[in-house]
């Protein structure tokens, strides 16, 4: 049985380009982001994988990445479930600010702490720990059972919601996970064992 799970961070968004804290705000993809999503589809096609089910967030940039990827891949009619549990970390009062504006208001050290600590949330927002607590129940209840039942599964989501999944899959600690960077539009291909641990992992660089 092929227990396939593929994770893809959405292509570059307009706010990624402007270096803004995005969180639950809903900007579209840039032209580069569109190209990245299509390139991810081509990379997966070249790798010879197929899909039975997809999961994405409640936000446009992840949904559009899924749609563009699947069109390029040749499975435009794949069943895809959208759920807010896979949304990006909520940056609260930082949302819509660029990194320099945030530093002016709260100081470099404080903003760095909010961005890179595991359990310190920005005002009105979520810490990475909060994001993990939101994402993992959905993974355990919906995504993982599909994978273990042999459904080849594609997830398009966000840097921090995918960090939550990778933390479990790669057995990373709260100390190591905040500093892990995820490139936009690059598929990470996991194959799982029957006990849900990782059998193999491959990053499909464009």
From Swiss-Prot:
It catalyses: (2R)-2-phosphoglycerate = (2R)-3-phosphoglycerate. Pathway: Carbohydrate degradation; glycolysis; pyruvate from D-glyceraldehyde 3-phosphate: step 3/5. The keyword Glycoprotein does not apply. Catalyzes the interconversion of 2-phosphoglycerate and 3-phosphoglycerate. It holds the Pfam family His_Phos_1. The record marks 158 as: Transition state stabilizer. Substrate binds at residues 9-16, 22-23, 61, 88-91, 99, 115-116, 159-160. PROSITE patterns: PG_MUTASE. NCBIfam families: pgm_1, PRK01295.1. Keywords: Gluconeogenesis, Glycolysis, Isomerase. Homodimer. GO terms for biological process: gluconeogenesis; glycolytic process. InterPro entries: His_Pase_superF_clade-1, His_PPase_superfam, PG/BPGM_mutase_AS, Phosphogly_mut1. The active site is at 10 (tele-phosphohistidine intermediate), 88 (proton donor/acceptor). Its EC number is 5.4.2.11. It is an enzyme of class 5 (isomerase). GO terms for molecular function: phosphoglycerate mutase activity. The keyword Isomerase applies. Belongs to the phosphoglycerate mutase family. BPG-dependent PGAM subfamily. This is 2,3-bisphosphoglycerate-dependent phosphoglycerate mutase.
């Amino acid at each position: 049985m092929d227990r396939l799970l593929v994770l893809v961070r959405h292509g570059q968004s307009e706010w990624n380009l402007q270096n803004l804290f995005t969180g639950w705000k809903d900007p579209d993809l840039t032209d580069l982001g569109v190209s990245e999503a299509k390139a991810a589809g081509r990379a997966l096609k070249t790798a010879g994988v197929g899909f039975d089910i997809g999961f994405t967030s409640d936000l446009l940039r992840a949904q559009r990445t899924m749609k563009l990827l699947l069109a390029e891949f040749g499975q435009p009619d794949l069943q895809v479930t959208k759920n807010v549990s896979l949304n990006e970390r909520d940056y609260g009062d930082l949302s819509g600010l660029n990194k320099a504006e945030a530093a002016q208001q709260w100081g470099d050290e404080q903003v760095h702490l909010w961005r890179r600590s595991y359990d310190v949330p920005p005002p009105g927002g979520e810490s990475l720990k909060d994001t993990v607590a939101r994402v993992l129940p959905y993974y355990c209840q919906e995504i993982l059972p599909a994978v273990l039942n042999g459904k080849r599964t594609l997830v398009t989501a966000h840097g921090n919601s995918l960090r939550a999944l990778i933390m479990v899959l790669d057995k990373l600690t709260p100390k190591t996970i905040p500093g892990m960077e995820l490139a936009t539009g690059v598929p990470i291909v996991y194959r799982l064992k029957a006990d849900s641990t990782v059998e193999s992992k491959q990053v499909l660089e464009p």
